[in-house]
């Protein structure tokens, strides 16, 4: 059976991996998952992103902890296959008053809400991370 929402699965694996104090998690890779993971790594929510080569590439994410607690307090899917959420540049949300980030899919690629605002771009809100 095929997976309905691979992005929600990725976010759930990150959430569950940190709840279980795992060092790293792995999952099937895709360009979108790698782009989202790279944004999370740039923002400091995960430690490392690695993609294995092969017939079925695997995405390995090294999770990050601070003083024994997970860096990611909450990660939630916003736009989903059954209900896509799009926002204009001036409607992009500020997660936790600017302390968290919204991952946005724009015409210029996957980026944070801050970068999208600076570039003057709107797009699909993929998830909120705090």
From Swiss-Prot:
Q: Where is the chain membrane-spanning?
A: none
Q: Which family does it belong to?
A: Belongs to the universal ribosomal protein uS8 family.
What GO MF terms are annotated? rRNA binding; structural constituent of ribosome
Q: Which GO terms describe its biological process?
A: translation
**How is this protein named in the record?**
Small ribosomal subunit protein uS8
Q: Which GO terms describe its cellular component?
A: ribonucleoprotein complex; ribosome
Protein source organism: Histophilus somni (strain 2336)
Keyword Transmembrane helix on entry: no
Gene responsible for this protein: rpsH
Q: Which domain of life is it from?
A: Bacteria
